[in-house]
Amino acid sequence: MKHRVLQIASALAMAGAALAAPAAQACDRVAAAQSDSQRLRTLMAESDAAFLDRNPSAAFYRGDFSDAGSLGDFSPAAYETERAAAMCDIAALATIDRAALTASERIAYDTFRYSQERTLAATEPDVLKTILALPIDHFQGIQGSYPGLSAPDGVMPFAAVEDYADNVARHGAYAQMVDDVIARFDTGLEQGITLPRLTVELMIDQLDTQLGAPEGSNPYYAPLRQLPESFTEAQKGQARAALISAVEGTLYPAMRKLRAYLADSYLPQARTSIGATATPGGDAYYAYRIAEMTTLPLTAEEVHRLGLSEVARINEARQQAIEERGDRRPPVYKTKESLQEAWYEVGRKVDAAIGPLFLRQPETELRIEPYEPYREQFFLAASYQPGKADGSRPGTFYFSGWNAAERELSPSIRLYMHEGNPGHHFQVMFAVEDESLPDLLRHGWFTAYGEGWALYAESLGYELGLYDDPVDRLQALEDGELKRAVRLVVDTGIHALGWTREQAVEYMVENGNPR
C-alpha cells in the first residue's frame, strides 16, 4: 500500500481550508469533455503514474525499471509532496459524479478516495511526528529489503550492461538514504521518540549478517557470479570493476555508518519501554495504526476485548483437538532441504484439494523457496512475494529454515493455504493479472482485505477435509487462529494498556505459545 511504501509528511500549519483551492488548481488535468467514467479512469491512472515517478522502488515490484538507478526520496520533504498529491487527487475526485458511475466504478471511486484519505491521516501532527522519527525498524527498512534489489534472484533485472550500471547507481542511492534515516532518527531523539532497544539490536544484527556474509552467499556480489553470457570480456571486466568499487567504496561504508550510528549513538538512547504510548504522541499514532490495519473505527480497548473473546472461543476447540491427537506430533525436519521437500508435499496436497472449489487459478506460477541467508533469521515463518503478470517472475512462498537443526520446524497446511494457494497468491495475482482494473485495484494493498481473504482461504481447510487429522487441525488452531487472537490481546496490551513485556510473554505462554 502506498502509504506503507512512503508515508506522508507536510507542513502541519496547513489549515483544512487550504485543502481544496490549491489542490483543485493543481489537479485541473482531467478533461471535462470526458464522461465521469473516463475521468475517473484517467485520474486514477495519472495519480498512480505520478506516484511511481516519485517512488521508483514501488515501481520495481511491478516490473517497471525505467528509473532503476534510484530509490526515491526518503527525506521529510518527500512527505510534503505526497500530502500535496493526495489533496490534489481528492479535490479532482470531488468533481466526478459518483452517481453517474457503474457499480464496479463506484468501488474504484471509493477505494481511491479511501486511499488518499488514509494518506492525509498520516499527516495528523502526532502521527506524522512519529512516522518521521521512526523511519525504519527490523521489519520495514532499507537495511532489510535492499539485498532483494541487489541480486539476480531478487526483483531487479541483471541481463544488460545498463542493469549493472543501475545496480551501481542504487548503491549510491542507498548511501543517501542512510543519511536521511540518520537525520530522521536524530530528530526523533530530540523529540523523545525512539525505537525500543530490542528492535535496534535486531537491526544491528541484520547489518552484521549482511556485512559478514561469505562470498558464496553474499547478495551484493551475486551479480558477478551470474554475468550474462551475452557480455563481451571487456563488458564483464567493466561490470566487475564497477560493482566491486561500488560495494567496497560506497555501499559497505554506508552500511557500516548506519551500523555504527545505531550501536554507538542511537542504542544508548533507545527506550527500554516497548509500548507505542510510552512516546510523545503515541496514543494518536497507535489509533492511526489500528485504523490503518482494520479500516474500522475501533478503539484499542475494543480490539483488546475482541481478542480476549476469540482466545476463549479458540481454546475450547484447541482443547478438543489436543485430546483427539493424543501423543502424536507433526514430523520435525532438521535440515533446510528436508523441510523444503516437506513444504513441496504440503503444496501438492493443498493444490490438488482446492481444484474443485475454483473455476480458475492464477496464470502465474507459485514456487516454494527458503528465505535467503541474509534475512532468514529475521523474517516470519513464511511469507508471500507476488509474481509478475507477464510470467517473468513467479509468485514465491518463502519459508524459514533458519537453524533447522536446533528448532522444531514443521510445514503447515494452514500456513500454505494462507500465504500461497488459495490465499495471498490467488488474491494478489488474480488482481495483478486483470488488466481491466485500475492499477490501484491491481497493485494496491489493504491489510484488512488481503489478510481477510487469507483467513478465509485458511478456513477452507475444514470444508476440504484437510484438517480432519487432529494434528493438522491443532496446527491450524494454534499456529493460526489462536496466535492471531493472542496478538490482538498482547498488541493492544503493550501499546495502549501499559502491559510489560513480561506480562505479554506470560499471556502468550498460557495460551499455546512455547516460551
Cite the ranges covered by each PLM segment.
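N-terminal maturation segment of proteins
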Residues: 26-515
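Gram-negative bacterial Sec-dependent N-terminal signal peptides
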Residues: 1-24
